[in-house]
Design a protein with these regions (language model features):
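GST-like domain detector, emphasizing the conserved glutathione-binding G-site
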Residues: 1-9, 14-123
Length: 124
């Protein structure tokens, strides 16, 4: 069975979960708390040496990290990924935009609001 190692409040993990639900694919979710060092254990690093979530355990026993790589893997052969070359390129265009031009700002703002105390000078 497809297994996702992820953190429920992570946007990158959420989009993988959303794709799995949209495709009605069975999966197992393993909650990993990166704030408690769970991505730095020997066991986790053997799956993903970068120590990041999400990481997917594929049916053949291999591991696939990075949310957009997982999304592309899941979408292959499904209605989520167009059959034509330009359509697939446009999907990748949006995935690159989301990951590199949009997500960094959202993730930083969310982390500041969620993890820094209200009186922290770093919140300014």
């Amino acid at each position: 069975m497809f297994t996702v190692y992820g953190k429920s409040d992570s946007g990158n993990c959420y989009k993988v979960k959303l794709a799995l639900e949209q495709l009605s694919l069975p999966y197992r979710w393993v909650e990993i708390d990166s704030t408690r060092g769970e991505t730095r254990t020997e066991s986790f690093l053997s799956m993903n040496p970068n120590g990041k979530v999400p990481t997917a355990a594929l049916e053949d026993g291999s591991f696939l990290p990075e949310s957009n790589a997982i999304l592309h893997y899941l979408a292959e052969g499904s209605p989520l990924l167009p059959a034509d070359r330009l359509g697939r390129a446009r999907v990748l265009q949006w995935m690159f935009f989301e990951q590199y031009s949009h997500e960094p700002y959202i993730a930083v703002a969310r982390s500041i609001l969620r993890y820094l105390p209200p009186d922290s000078p770093r919140r300014a």
